[in-house]
Regions:
Chain A
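Helical element adjacent to the flavin cofactor pocket in flavoenzyme catalytic cores
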Residues: 154-203, 207, 219, 236
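Short hydrophobic core segments
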Residues: 4-6, 43, 228-240, 377
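Helix-loop-beta segment of a Rossmann-like dinucleotide-binding subdomain
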Residues: 96-109, 121-122, 131-175, 301-305, ...
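Dinucleotide-binding Rossmann-like beta1-alpha1 core, especially the glycine-rich loop
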Residues: 59-143
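Glycine-rich FAD pyrophosphate-binding loop
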Residues: 20-55
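C-terminal catalytic lobe of FAD-dependent flavoproteins
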Residues: 333-411
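Short beta-strand to alpha-helix junction loop
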Residues: 70, 74-80, 107-115, 155-174, ...
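Active-site substrate-recognition segment that forms the wall
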Residues: 14, 18, 61-62, 66, ...
Length: 411, 266
């Protein structure tokens, strides 16, 4: 069986590794009896470092409650479920990736106390089942000594965490390369990086029964145009699938848009913060994610724009002054990197899986990629399983994750 | 409700609504539809307008505006000088094919207070250039008068600083502007927090309300949009109906013949 994955960002890599391992076949006996091996072709316009992916330009926060004021409750539920799923997934990788679940802290300056109190009320009203601790200045000083100096109170959300987003992308690449060499399942991976997909066209042999349908992917690789036919195509392109970035015969998602985000990577050895911190501010959404050995990620803007040019001075001033107000030690930090990237979002800012015949499209993870990826992965694998076995089994996360038949074919 | 007149265009709704800060574009769309508003403001300052990088969201907003048979009102939010505002205004006219403009020139970073001098300067240049200017200004009578004299048929004084939700900070000033500029279309812009704030301004005789945060940041923006729509209607009807005069002495609505006035102690 030939399966194509288009896009080797976070989702593309996770799906590729699972298919290479044969994880889509949930039943172990079935997996063993499955004589037909799978050949996976992973297409990506980027090189294998994935520096142009939304996942690279992220902070890897796993903070469902911290996000809850700006997202729907189903994202929060998927976030908590993913926090449960990540450790098993990471344990299966040889390369070490930071996974921390020691809670997160929310703070606000005295003049913005109204927003802080509103947030506490929001959590208590909408998420009473999850723990939260309001901290006095003394308690905050004890938990995060260097934050306590600047704030009179804070909120501690003990279940929140973070992941090493960039390390994970590297770990997944290495794992894919290793397992491809020593695969026991007979499955094979062919990773075509720096390859531009220019067409994803369906060929339906039978209008009523689409199980026979195949897809032909046209692509430019090394200057040559080539075509290849697949039994199944899993599209994980992110912003590459917007109407602007994707041609008519390349299965664009018409409701998908790009939302610009900017962040800094700072080296601040004099700052000692051990867990993610969010600053509640009426104008900015700021988080500081400690990434070990003195590195911090400070983000992130959210601008309705598909511009991925370098960070603007205004955004830089907003992010850095907000970070400085949380900890004056950032004044002496080195700016190691400033990153701008676009995140893919549908008009309701919800993720969506659409499928029709031999095409599955996973998109719209917006600013919640790492927060919900394991849940999205399981849902995709269940769909693949249904497709391969021609079954219609219930999908595990249909209550949370919109999964629907693609209504109109653009091709 | 009677029609709202914006530069000769008669609109059914007296609510003008912003398109920022909503949880998602879809919620924004539903809130605008629920509000009944036919004028939607949008800013383009941060979207690299020279490259038209905000095309996707602009198109989305334009589709909503078309659906309600309304008008787009581009603004110059984020501009600090007349020069900057004029440049952005020209770009927005080119992109959105409208000469309507909410003119905003900020003079203070902390409370985002408009700069009256730069505002007048920009308004003068833009009117000469054919723009229909809707200036966002402070509640200063003389400034409003000057803007009106320049040719701004619509004047938009603030209720309180943008995004504070503090409501009508200086009702005396706002009433004075209404009394002294009876022919201007007066829209109360910024600082509205609750539907009752909007209702109060409409009872004063304001022609309309422009708001954004009060709806977008509500726990349920769509429901709040409806609440504002009702509040504006109530305030407008109250103004037309004529509010009774306040009195010092109680006046029973049911005559109490057995209590003659000379029985009072004081």
């Amino acid at each position: 069986m030939n399966i194509a994955i288009v896009g080797a960002g976070l989702m593309g890599r996770l799906v590729a590794l699972s298919l290479l391992r044969g994880d889509q076949l949930r039943d172990k006996k079935l997996r063993q009896s499955q004589s037909q091996s799978v050949t996976i072709t992973l297409f990506d316009k980027d090189n294998k470092l994935a520096h142009n992916s939304a996942a690279y330009a992220a902070a890897g926060l796993l903070t469902p409650l911290g996000e809850s004021l700006h997202c729907e409750p189903n994202i929060v539920s998927m976030g908590f479920e993913s926090l449960r799923l990540w450790p098993t997934l990471l344990d299966s990788l040889d390369e070490h990736t930071i996974f921390q679940q020691t809670g997160a802290i929310m703070v606000s300056h005295e003049q913005d106390k109204g927003d802080y109190q509103r947030f506490i009320k929001h959590l208590k009203n909408n998420y009473p089942e999850h723990a939260l601790h309001t901290l006095s200045r003394a308690e905050l000083l004890k938990l995060e000594p260097e934050i306590g100096r600047s704030f009179n109170q804070g909120l501690y959300l003990p279940q929140e965490g973070q992941i090493g987003n960039r390390r994970l992308l590297v770990a997944l690449r290495k794992q894919l390369e290793k397992e491809n060499k020593h695969t026991s399942s007979g499955n094979k991976l062919n990773w075509l990086s720096e390859c531009q997909v220019i067409g994803i066209e369906g060929e339906i042999k039978n209008e009523i029964n689409t199980t026979d349908e195949t897809r032909t992917i046209s692509y430019l690789h090394g200057g040559d145009k080539q075509c290849q036919r697949f039994d199944l195509v899993i599209d994980c392109r992110g912003t590459g699938a917007t109407s602007k970035n994707s041609q008519r015969d390349c299965a664009p998602l018409s409701d998908l848009r790009s939302v610009r985000g900017e962040l800094f990577q700072l080296f601040a050895p004099d700052v000692h913060i051990s867990r993610p911190v969010r600053l509640m501010h009426p104008r900015y959404q700021l988080y500081i994610a400690p990434k070990q050995k003195g590195f911090y990620v400070v983000g992130a803007t959210e601008i309705e724009s598909d511009d991925d040019s370098p960070m603007t001075v205004r955004s830089a001033m907003e992010l850095l002054s907000a970070a400085y107000s949380v900890h004056p030690g950032f004044a002496e930090a080195n700016i190691r990197q400033h990153v701008s990237q676009c995140r893919p979002a549908f008009s309701d800012n919800q993720p969506k899986i659409t499928h029709k015949g031999s095409l599955i499209q996973v998109n719209g993870l917006f600013r919640h990629g790492f927060l919900i990826a394991p849940v999205v992965l399981r849902q995709v694998l269940a769909l693949v399983n249904n497709r391969i076995n021609n079954t219609n089994d219930n999908l595990p996360y249909s209550d949370y994750l919109r999964t629907e038949q693609r209504q109109e074919e653009m091709i | 409700m009677m029609a709202l007149n914006i530069y000769g265009h008669q609109l059914d709704s007296r609510l003008l609504i912003g398109s920022a800060l909503y949880p998602s574009p879809e919620v924004m769309k539903q809130a605008i539809l629920a509000s009944g508003s036919q004028v939607v403001t949008l800013s383009l300052k941060r979207q690299n307008p020279a490259e038209q990088s905000g095309q996707q969201i602009w198109r989305y907003i334009q589709e909503v505006v078309t659906e309600v048979n309304g008008h787009l009102l581009p603004n110059t939010a984020g501009c600090k000088t007349a020069k900057e505002a004029v440049t952005l205004a020209k770009m927005s006219r080119e992109i959105f094919k409208t000469n309507w403009l909410k003119l905003e020139v900020i003079g203070d970073d902390y409370n985002l207070q408009p700069d009256p001098i730069e505002l007048l300067n920009a308004a003068e240049q833009l009117i000469k250039d054919g723009f229909k200017v809707l200036p966002y200004c402070t509640d200063d009578l003389v400034l409003c008068q000057r803007l009106y004299d320049l040719g701004c048929q619509v004047i938009m004084p603030w209720a309180s600083p943008i995004g504070t939700g503090k409501g009508l900070m200086n009702p005396y000033n706002l009433e004075t502007i209404r009394l002294r500029l009876p022919d201007a279309t007066l829209i109360l812009d910024a600082g509205i927090g609750k539907p009752s704030d909007a209702c109060l301004a409409m009872e004063m005789g304001y022609d309309g309300i422009l708001l954004n945060s009060a709806v977008a940041l509500a726990d349920n923006p769509i429901l709040m949009a409806k609440a504002f729509s009702h509040a504006l209607e109530a305030g407008e009807q109250a103004y037309v109906a004529g509010v009774m005069q306040q009195r010092q002495t109680a006046h029973p609505s049911t005559p109490t013949l057995d209590t003659p006035f000379w029985h009072q102690n004081s």
